[in-house]
Amino acid sequence: MSAARLSAVAQSTVYAFSARPLAGGEPVSLGSLRGKVLLIENVASLUGTTTRDYTEMNDLQKRLGPRGLVVLGFPCNQFGHQENGKNEEILNSLKYVRPGGGFEPNFTLFEKCEVNGEKAHPLFTFLRNALPAPSDDPTALMTDPKYIIWSPVCRNDISWNFEKFLVGPDGVPVRRYSRRFRTIDIEPDIEALLSKQPSNP
């Protein structure tokens, strides 16, 4: 493949991006996940849906991970300051507070990042441009302007915690879901993508 073609592919897929795991260490290149179906969510420890969404993310990773699903969580404090702890505090918050009861995520969590505005992680800028609005709620917007703490504000901004992006095994974003769309209800779309995977990803 020519260098120009490789560059074009990189710009149209998530494979050009990387992020540092919450546990530390070297950044993980999403290019290492070629052939996998990715479910990417911006998460928060103190949201009203934290327990529901985290447990459903764990459930999908446990059941569909062996078939090629990879769930990725990106903690973000831009929505109601609901991820206001330090990176090293997040896992304890999940374990002892919400969801609590010894909960441990079985999917990869990355370091805190911003998903909107000038300092947004490049992956989320790419995802928002590729899928400008949630498919289940195309008019989704931040409902209370006092919560907008980033600049510039764009029409394709993520509106709250736990928006979801589904990425196909070719690295191309397929569908965006609003915070109101339950994580577990994405399963049929994940199944459809898993059935299209190459036999040896």
Swiss-Prot record:
Catalysed reaction, written as an equation: 2 glutathione + H2O2 = glutathione disulfide + 2 H2O; a hydroperoxy polyunsaturated fatty acid + 2 glutathione = a hydroxy polyunsaturated fatty acid + glutathione disulfide + H2O; tert-butyl hydroperoxide + 2 glutathione = tert-butanol + glutathione disulfide + H2O; cumene hydroperoxide + 2 glutathione = 2-phenylpropan-2-ol + glutathione disulfide + H2O
Site (Subject to oxidation and hydroselenide loss to dehydroalanine): 47
Tissue distribution: Expressed in liver and lung.
Phosphoserine: residues carrying this PTM: 32, 195, 199
GO biological process: angiogenesis involved in wound healing; apoptotic process; arachidonate metabolic process; biological process involved in interaction with symbiont; blood vessel endothelial cell migration; cell redox homeostasis; cellular response to glucose stimulus; cellular response to oxidative stress
InterPro entries: Glutathione_peroxidase, GPX_AS, GPX_CS, Thioredoxin-like_sf
Predominant location: cytoplasm
PROSITE patterns in the record: GLUTATHIONE_PEROXID_1 (PS00460), GLUTATHIONE_PEROXID_2 (PS00763), GLUTATHIONE_PEROXID_3 (PS51355)
GO cellular component terms listed in the entry, alphabetical order: cytoplasm; cytosol; Lewy body; mitochondrion
EC number: 1.11.1.9, 1.11.1.12
Keywords recorded for this protein, A-Z: Acetylation, Cytoplasm, Lipid metabolism, Mitochondrion, Oxidoreductase, Peroxidase, Phosphoprotein, Selenocysteine
Domain of life: Eukaryota
Subcellular localization, as worded in the UniProt entry: Cytoplasm; Mitochondrion
Subunit comment: Homotetramer. Interacts with MIEN1.
Similarity comment: Belongs to the glutathione peroxidase family.
Listed name of the protein: Glutathione peroxidase 1
Organism of derivation: Rattus norvegicus (Rat)
Gene field: Gpx1
